[in-house]
Amino acid sequence: MTISNTRDITPELIEAHGLKPDEYQRILDLIGREPTFTELGIFSAMWNEHCSYKSSKKWLRTLPTTGPRVIQGPGENAGVVDIGDGDCVVFKMESHNHPSYIEPYQGAATGVGGILRDVFTMGARPVAAMNALRFGEPDHPKTRHLVSGVVSGVGGYGNAFGVPTVGGEVNFDKRYNGNILVNAFAAGLAKHDGIFLSEAKGVGLPVVYLGAKTGRDGVGGATMASAEFDESIEEKRPTVQVGDPFTEKCLLEACLELMASGAVIAIQDMGAAGLTCSAVEMGAKGDLGIELILDHVPVREENMTAYEMMLSESQERMLMVLKPEKEAEAQAIFRKWGLDFAIVGKTTDDLRFRVIHQGEEVANLPIKDLGDEAPEYDRPWMEPGKHAPLPASNVPQVEDYSTALLKLIGSPDLSSRRWVYEQYDTLIQGNSLQVPGGDAGVIRVEGHDTKALAFSSDVTPRYCEADPFEGGKQAVAECWRNITATGAEPLASTDNLNFGNPEKPEIMGQLVKAIEGIGEACRALDFPIVSGNVSLYNETNGQAILPTPTIAGVGLIPDWTQTAKIGGMQDGDTLVLLGGDGTHLGQSIYLRDLFDRADGPAPTVDLALEKRNGEFVRSAIRNGQVTACHDLSDGGLAIAVAEMAIKSGKGAELDAGDGLPHAVLFGEDQARYVVAATAEMAKLIALNAEGAGVPFRVLGTVGGDSLKIGNVVDVSVADLTDAFEGWFPGFMSGEPVSDN
């Protein structure tokens, strides 16, 4: 057959496909001729950042990805971790940033759909979801619209699909004005012997298309996700996919039923770059070629070209290599669920990716060079600058700490996210033990009497901007700490690395140092990275986002009756600070929100201290010594105890300590927790802390209806609650954004 070429391949067309001149020359050298238009689209999709990780691959290899519980690390649709009794948890986090800015509802909804597919493609039934959302400053004209659309999209898809949203984050910063971030996490449960991978095995086997029909939605989506935005952003709306959670629910049930039948050899969901990426990955991983016949692809639009079919990112679709003798059984299962089932090709032994449309060969390419041997860059990078030290004595104090506390707890970044999570179904499936609003979400493991899992997602972007290395460490440490604060043992993590343009050495430097920090923390805390995603080119008109390496993690609770949450304080309990008093105000919320300053270094993360203090806290929780626990992060001690008071509906009378009041109250030193315990248990905790070398201070007693800290803070729990709960609903109702 001759290869037809439907369009002239011009320099403008090459540039429009996101390919650099040297990359196009590499294509010419590789195939010895000019590519067809369809082939150009295939190379564009497979060689962009979104699919190939060409700028980050070198550095991602340095991350720790193995451990005694790790069954499957990076490289598959999701990571797999052993939780005992033949069970495993399957999880991943992934970005849907660019589509969510252009079309917030569908962008966020299909982000949720995509991550759920990644999990059930592995053979796991999804049991939990989270989402980490970053928006522009509240008074930016688009922020309210984007928040509303994204939250509705996340809830609309997750609720209809039937998975509980158990946690997440919402932040606001002007650096996200032109590029919001939507990072979606999902976890599922499977049996050890029920894990399915994407590596095709065997020659001449049928390649089967499953799920919804193919349309033109999302054509070029992966390429768009690898580019900066500019003034033409609205023109990119057609590249956003449209999701249908009910079809996805049917796809889940059909896939799990088919997997149980023993028919599946390999399976890959169609995400970024659709049919192209899924077929190439399956073949390249198995050292096989793939031949596709596009005339057999189920379509929902007329006159679709080969280019459009290969690059469509229509949702709720899978590609599978099937045992031939199981074909009729497989078809019957998918027909029963009202889904398309079509044999669209076969595996071959020639390592070629061949695409046939209307009797013509429109693509014939070396499959390994598209897949696991795609280009890889060692981009130049600059060491990020360091901030000068900032002693607390050089940071101004406020006249009224009660007013300061009310302002901070009612601020955009620290106020309650109830407005967000009440739009999500947090209880569906009936296993949720701790819902959003605490340190981590907790769910029971179905079919097990006592076992539970904890989930958290964390990063502090302003720390990463000030010091990407310490910021990367801190993201891991805080995720580990939040999981620990429930009494769970952190098992493993997934990363979602959101950065600007890697072609700028200063941005590449942020990425390199953040990965270095993440790796160091994961090694020290035995918290390996088992899956992840990189999202680069998050810039608009040259303005990059804050570096945002989101870390999500999973922890195991052997007995869910021995857990802690932030709202468990009882009258008469003693509060104990574990980890020492605050001294560090550099890059703090106190400095930023009260004085509009972003100076000083990010707090240093002492990983040995993190591990020692965290293991001590976990032991106390599991031994039944603790009635409530909260880790310290943004806003320090004052915010932590205020949140505990609000969630418990109880006041407390606490000692202010001996340090500078603003540092003790609002310092953001790491590796710290506040625990509540009965008076007797608090004595035991203090005694044990002394023996373990864990710094501690007995803060005071729970009771009354006000939070009193020495003679510097005296605020009623009712006023704290009003401030905490009031900001978000007020903002979304259209009230002017105030500084309180």
UniProtKB/Swiss-Prot annotation:
Family matches, as CDD domains: PurL_repeat1, PurL_repeat2
One annotated Gene Ontology cellular component of this protein: cytoplasm
Main localization, broad class: cytoplasm
Entry binding sites for Mg(2+) 2: D118, D269
Disulfide cysteine pairs (residue numbers): none
Role description: Part of the phosphoribosylformylglycinamidine synthase complex involved in the purines biosynthetic pathway. Catalyzes the ATP-dependent conversion of formylglycinamide ribonucleotide (FGAR) and glutamine to yield formylglycinamidine ribonucleotide (FGAM) and glutamate. The FGAM synthase complex is composed of three subunits. PurQ produces an ammonia molecule by converting glutamine to glutamate. PurL transfers the ammonia molecule to FGAR to form FGAM in an ATP-dependent manner.
Protein family (similarity comment): Belongs to the FGAMS family.
Protein name, entry field: Phosphoribosylformylglycinamidine synthase subunit PurL
